[in-house]
């Protein structure tokens, strides 16, 4: 790989390591999301602790953390395989942020942002899959896990060169939901449309 490729991969990881949830909560005077709610620095937990606008800001910022470096990779016409690893680096940064003791979020929004430049068809199918599962089950965590399991098939169909790195990203997402999966198995996971949310669920 070229020096530019290595720099972009490093830059994607560092950008992903910036915790949007912590920053927006500080700006809005909200509690630290790492110490309240689900203790997860993500948009869902920010919404849970009372910041609707902050939650929206976190969601958009986390999406951009994945979308911007991947878009730059396409703009620079880097090899598809390199772009895939740029996406992986951004998600690794969000999940294991170097600036926050490697304790980050679950990576759903950042992974979605990374997928958008790869193809609107794949991104649309991912959103559709998430919504379909959520409307049937009511579980946002189950929706995220099933979508993560299916997205590699979408990528393989539309851009097979990206299948391996995207599959790695999706494996990370499933791993980060292991607590949710255990609660789903035990029947202890709260449904997304309930007013009372579980303190253990969230992105």
From Swiss-Prot:
Domain of life: Bacteria
Protein name: Glycerol-3-phosphate acyltransferase
Reaction equations catalysed: an acyl phosphate + sn-glycerol 3-phosphate = a 1-acyl-sn-glycero-3-phosphate + phosphate
Enzyme class (EC, first level): transferase
Known function: Catalyzes the transfer of an acyl group from acyl-phosphate (acyl-PO(4)) to glycerol-3-phosphate (G3P) to form lysophosphatidic acid (LPA). This enzyme utilizes acyl-phosphate as fatty acyl donor, but not acyl-CoA or acyl-ACP.
Family classification: Belongs to the PlsY family.
TM helices/strands, residue ranges: 4-24, 56-76, 80-100, 115-135, 149-169
Membrane topology: Multi-pass membrane protein
InterPro entries associated with the record: G3P_acylTferase_PlsY (IPR003811)
BP GO annotations: phospholipid biosynthetic process
Gene: plsY
GO CC term, one of those recorded: plasma membrane
Main location: membrane
Subunit structure: Probably interacts with PlsX.
Keyword match Transferase: yes
Pathway where it operates: Lipid metabolism; phospholipid metabolism
Cystines in this chain: none
Any one GO molecular-function label of the UniProt entry: acyl-phosphate glycerol-3-phosphate acyltransferase activity
EC number(s) given by UniProt: 2.3.1.275
Keywords: Cell inner membrane, Cell membrane, Lipid biosynthesis, Lipid metabolism, Membrane, Phospholipid biosynthesis, Phospholipid metabolism, Transferase, Transmembrane, Transmembrane helix
Subcellular location: Cell inner membrane
PANTHER family: GLYCEROL-3-PHOSPHATE ACYLTRANSFERASE-RELATED, INNER MEMBRANE PROTEIN YGIH
